[in-house]
Amino acid sequence: MQQLNPSEISELIRARIAGFEGRVETRSQGTIISLSDGILRIHGLEDVMYGEMLELPGGRFGLAMNLEQDNVGAVVLGEFSGLQEGDVVKCTGRVMQVPIGKALLGRVVNALGQPVDGKGAIDAEEFDVLEKIAPGVIDRQSVDEPMQTGIKSIDAMVPIGRGQRELIIGDRQTGKTAVAVDAILNQKGKDVQCIYVAIGQKASTVAGVVRKLEEYGAMEYTTVIAANASESAAMQYLAPYAGCTMGEYFRDRGMNALIVYDDLTKQAWAYRQISLLLRRPPGREAYPGDVFYLHSRLLERAARVNADFVEKFTKGEVKGKTGSLTALPIIETQAGDVSAFVPTNVISITDGQIYLETDLFNAGIRPAINAGLSVSRVGGAAQTKIIKKLGGGIRLDLAQYRELAAFAQFASDLDEITRKQIERGKRVTELLKQDQFSPMSVAEQGAALFAASSGALDDVEVANVRPFEKALLAYLNSNNKELMAGIEEKKDLTDDLKKQLDAAVKQFKSGSTY
C-alpha cells in the first residue's frame, strides 16, 4: 500500500482550499415597523436599491419606493392581508422584471406578467426590466410608414405613423376605447403585434374587450394586460411599464408593435395615491412633483428605431430592418377640460391628439372627432398617397363647415357659395361616420373619399349618404375587384386608376338604387 508523505497531504489540502467556492449569500433583511393601505415601512434594509423587489412572507413581493434615513417605504404588489408588524423582509438584489416574447400573444396577464385567463402557465422566452431608458436621438428613425387605423376620419384628418405617440382624449363615454380597439382590429394580417393595457377598469369591461378581440380574430396577435379597479394602486401604476417592456421586445428585433394605454388618467390617480401614502409632498391637484416624468419616461419609449440599432441589439441576426412601437395613450377629461394638469402634460409629450367631443357623440357623429382640436404632428409624412390626395382638404372643409353652420343659425339669407359649402359639409360629416368594429381598407377609404371629392355625393340626399357609401363599396368589391386590389397594392391613385374609379362610380350611380 502506497503511503502519502506529509508534504503531499498538505499539497492536496491546499489544492482543495484553492478550488473551494464560497456559496455564502449575503442579503440585507429588515423588519416591518408599520403597515397600512398597502404601504410598508421597513427598518434595517441597509443596502436596498430604489425600485428593488423585496421578498415578503408568504411568497409575496414588494417594491422599494422611498429610501429614507431610518426606514424604507415600499408598496406591496398584490394582496397585503396576512402581513403584520415584525415580519421579516429580505432584499432580492434585482429590480422588477416581466416575461417577454411571442408566448404572451393571445394571453391576458396582470401587471407582473402572470396569466389571469385560466389558460395555464406562459412559457416565456426571457424576462426584462420594467423601467428602461428610451432610445436616444441617434438610434431613432423618422416616422414615415403609416399605421392604418381603418377609421376614415383618423386616417384622412389625423394620420398616425409607425413609431408615433397619438393621444386619444375626451370625456367618459365618447368612444375612446372603441377607437383604440378598432385600430387593433385593423392590424390583422399586417404583421403588427398589439398590446392592450387596461388600467383601473371594471373586470367586466376588460372581459368585453377580450371577447370582441377573440370574436374578430385579433387576439392571436394581441396581449392584454389587466390591472383592474379591484387591484392595488401599485399594480395599476406598474401595468403601463409592463406593457411597454413587452412591446419593446418586438420593436428592438425589427418588428412593429402597437400599444394602447387605457387609460393613463387612472395610472396618474394610482401614482398620486401611492405618493400621498408614502408622505411625498403634494403639488398641483395633489399630484406629486414628478407626475410629468411618470408619463414622459413611459411614452418616450414608443419610437421607431433605425436598422443600425436593431442590428446591434440582435448582434447581427436581423439586418436592414427598422423596428417600431406606436403608442395610443388614452386620457379621460372631466367636463371637456383639456387644460387640467394631466391632460396638458400628456398633450405636450405626445405627437398629436384625437379629441373626442361629447356633443358630437350625442349628435350621432361617431367617431366623435373634433376636426378643429385634433392634430397629428408627425403623421402627415407617413400618410398613404391616395388618402393624402383625396382627404387633404377634408379637415379644413369640416372645420369651415362647423363655423359656417353655427353662423347660419343666425343668418336668414345665405349666398350661393356659403350654401354649397354647408351642403357639402353635411355630406362629408355623414360620410365620415363609421360603425364600430368595421375598420376599412385603404382602397375602401380611397373610394369613399373619391366619391366625396369628385362631387358624386352632391346630388345624394344627406340621409342617403351612408347607404350610398355602403352600396358603392359592395359594388366595387364585387364588380371591380382588380381595381380595388390595384389601389390597395399601390396605395396611390394614378391617372389610370383614377379614370377606372371615376367610370366605376358613374356606372354605379347610373344603375343602382340605395
From Swiss-Prot:
One of its GO terms (molecular function) is ATP binding. It comes from the Bacteria. It is a peripheral membrane protein. CDD domains: ATP-synt_F1_alpha_C, ATP-synt_F1_alpha_N, F1-ATPase_alpha_CD. Keywords: ATP synthesis, ATP-binding, Cell inner membrane, Cell membrane, CF(1), Hydrogen ion transport, Ion transport, Membrane, Nucleotide-binding, Translocase, Transport. This is ATP synthase subunit alpha. GO terms for cellular component: plasma membrane; proton-transporting ATP synthase complex. Pfam families: ATP-synt_ab, ATP-synt_ab_C, ATP-synt_ab_N. Signal peptide: none annotated. Produces ATP from ADP in the presence of a proton gradient across the membrane. The alpha chain is a regulatory subunit. Its main location: membrane. It catalyses: ATP + H2O + 4 H(+)(in) = ADP + phosphate + 5 H(+)(out). NCBIfam families: atpA, PRK13343.1. Belongs to the ATPase alpha/beta chains family. Its EC number is 7.1.2.2. F-type ATPases have 2 components, CF(1) - the catalytic core - and CF(0) - the membrane proton channel. CF(1) has five subunits: alpha(3), beta(3), gamma(1), delta(1), epsilon(1). CF(0) has three main subunits: a(1), b(2) and c(9-12). The alpha and beta chains form an alternating ring which encloses part of the gamma chain. CF(1) is attached to CF(0) by a central stalk formed by the gamma and epsilon chains, while a peripheral stalk is formed by the delta and b chains. ATP binds at G170, D171, R172, Q173, T174, G175, K176, T177. It is an enzyme of class 7 (translocase). It comes from Acidithiobacillus ferrooxidans (strain ATCC 23270 / DSM 14882 / CIP 104768 / NCIMB 8455) (Ferrobacillus ferrooxidans (strain ATCC 23270)). The record marks S374 as: Required for activity. It is found in: Cell inner membrane.
